[in-house]
Amino acid sequence: MTNSKQINLLKIVLGIVQLLLILLFTWAGVMKLLFPGELPWLWAKENPDLVAVTGVVDLVAGLGLLLPLLPHISSKLTLYAAYGISVLMLAAGLFHILRGESDQIGFNLFVLVCALFLAWGKRKALHQIKK
């Protein structure tokens, strides 16, 4: 595979990951803010204030990934949102471990890897633009 094909493939994969994270965090934010009683997780029923806070954070994360797709909005916002999602997933994993729910962190780890991959790819792209 030539270098330009690899770069194009990387851009496609990064775009798919970004889109999936946008959908995930926008959905999670809307569900936590508008329908908190319908959430299936035990922790959500025990911590309604935390559900509201994480709902806002999730929605901001989704918007932080979505807005840079619009014209005249810096793609650095994607990088910052991906870093923020990484911190959020680390905190969520720690939260579950402290609650004795370490079997629940697989999804958090998957999202963490996706966010770090997106941050790596966007950082790499931003450095190439500067050259």
Where are these regions (language model features)?
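Membrane-interface extramembranous regions
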Residues: 2-131
